[in-house]
């Protein structure tokens, strides 16, 4: 089965969770563990990149003086 070059965030996270479970099981050989660890690092980086891009894209639209203006997303949830 051909794999897409990159997975979406949810697929990457699910695959990462599966890898962690396999590693924690203790049933993998050293080579299999190293391969799973390497793949886990790659997936972690992909997830971090996806989250970073999503955070940059998320903006709150505020209505001011009848016009829409964009305000950066406040991750803390502090609204004045």
Curated annotation (Swiss-Prot):
InterPro entries: Exonuc_VII_S (IPR003761), Exonuc_VII_ssu_sf (IPR037004). Keywords: Cytoplasm, Exonuclease, Hydrolase, Nuclease. The keyword Nuclease applies. It is found in: Cytoplasm. Its EC number is 3.1.11.6. It catalyses: Exonucleolytic cleavage in either 5'- to 3'- or 3'- to 5'-direction to yield nucleoside 5'-phosphates. SUPFAM superfamilies: XseB-like. GO terms for biological process: DNA catabolic process. GO terms for molecular function: exodeoxyribonuclease VII activity. Its main location: cytoplasm. Pfam families: Exonuc_VII_S. GO terms for cellular component: cytosol; exodeoxyribonuclease VII complex. Bidirectionally degrades single-stranded DNA into large acid-insoluble oligonucleotides, which are then degraded further into small acid-soluble oligonucleotides. Heterooligomer composed of large and small subunits. Belongs to the XseB family. NCBIfam families: PRK00977.1-4, xseB. This is Exodeoxyribonuclease 7 small subunit. It comes from Pseudomonas aeruginosa (strain ATCC 15692 / DSM 22644 / CIP 104116 / JCM 14847 / LMG 12228 / 1C / PRS 101 / PAO1). The lineage of its organism: Bacteria, Pseudomonadati, Pseudomonadota, Gammaproteobacteria, Pseudomonadales. The gene is xseB.
């Amino acid at each position: 089965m051909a794999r897409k070059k990159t997975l979406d965030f949810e697929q990457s996270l699910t695959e990462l969770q599966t890898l962690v479970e396999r590693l924690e099981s203790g049933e993998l050989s050293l080579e299999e563990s190293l391969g799973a660890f390497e793949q886990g690092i790659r997936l972690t980086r992909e997830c971090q990149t996806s989250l970073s891009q999503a955070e940059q894209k998320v903006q709150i639209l505020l209505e001011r003086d009848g016009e829409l203006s964009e305000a950066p997303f406040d991750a803390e949830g502090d609204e004045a």
